[in-house]
């Protein structure tokens, strides 16, 4: 995955309280202190089904650290999203496109990457709680903020992001669930349009018109005979 959709608001962001212009100027530089971002969507966006907000904070920035680089003297706000506890992390990875890996190969890569950081495959299977090979290419794991730094620089690792809820009500981080080696596919909601009441009534009216009136109403009236008229 070479590109990332950064269409949503930041997950953990310390924006200027007066204007967003400094943020835009920072994003245009090559050296970034923080980046607003969302789960990458190289194939399709899931933001339509799950309105969520995410952001990237690198190893030099977090909401819990003092902002020593703020030379403006202006007070800055901290925005924390539900589920963002710096113990749940999203590791976004990129894969070659030609040939593209299979789903199984991508899952193996996720586990091997996590095992490299945690020291064993057993620990990797215990700490990976979700992943995706479609809406984004990456996995989610429970590690400390300090341990999350170890992912940086590993082969294929593109982003290391604090994870946050996609479904706040159910405290769901999204993705296909991974529980001790068992994969539970994510059930994405589907849109089913409701049938219009007016169209239903129109359909019934059409049937009545097509069938016509009852037989006794269709009988022609008998013409009056000369005898009856006299």
Curated annotation (Swiss-Prot):
Residues 1-55 form a transit peptide. Keywords: Chloroplast, Plastid, Transit peptide. Residues 208-224 have a biased composition (Basic and acidic residues). Pfam families: MORF_dom (PF21864). GO terms for biological process: chloroplast RNA modification; cytidine to uridine editing. Residues 197-207 have a biased composition (Basic residues). The lineage of its organism: Eukaryota, Viridiplantae, Streptophyta, Embryophyta, Tracheophyta. Signal peptide: none annotated. Residues 189-230 are annotated as: Disordered. This is DAG protein, chloroplastic. One of its GO terms (cellular component) is chloroplast. It comes from Antirrhinum majus. Expression detected in the dark, but enhanced by light. It comes from the Eukaryota. Expressed in leaves, flowers including petals, and to a low level in roots. Transmembrane segments: none annotated. It is found in: Plastid, Chloroplast. Its main location: plastid. Acts very early in chloroplast development, being required for expression of RNA polymerase beta subunit gene, and hence indirectly for subsequent expression of CAB and RBCS genes.
């Amino acid at each position: 995955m070479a590109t990332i959709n950064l269409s949503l608001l930041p997950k953990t962001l310390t924006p200027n309280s007066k204007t967003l212009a400094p943020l835009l100027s920072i994003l245009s530089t090559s050296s970034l202190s923080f980046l607003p971002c969302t789960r990458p969507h190289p194939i399709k966006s899931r933001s339509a089904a799950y309105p969520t907000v995410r952001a990237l904070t690198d190893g030099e920035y977090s909401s819990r650290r003092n902002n020593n680089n703020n030379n403006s003297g202006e007070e800055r706000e901290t925005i924390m999203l539900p589920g963002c506890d710096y113990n749940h992390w999203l590791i976004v990875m990129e894969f070659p496109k030609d040939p593209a890996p299979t789903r199984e190969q991508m899952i193996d890569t996720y586990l091997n990457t996590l095992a490299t950081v945690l020291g064993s495959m057993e620990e990797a299977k215990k700490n990976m709680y979700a992943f995706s090979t479609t809406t984004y290419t990456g996995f989610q794991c429970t590690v400390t903020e300090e341990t999350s730094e170890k992912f940086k620089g590993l082969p294929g690792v593109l982003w290391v992001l604090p994870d946050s809820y996609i479904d706040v009500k159910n405290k769901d981080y999204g993705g296909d669930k991974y529980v001790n080696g068992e994969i539970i596919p994510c059930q994405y909601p589907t849109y089913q349009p409701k049938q219009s009441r007016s169209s239903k009534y129109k359909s019934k009216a059409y049937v009545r018109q097509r069938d016509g009136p009852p037989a006794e109403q269709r009988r022609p009236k008998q013409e009056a005979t000369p005898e009856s008229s006299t």
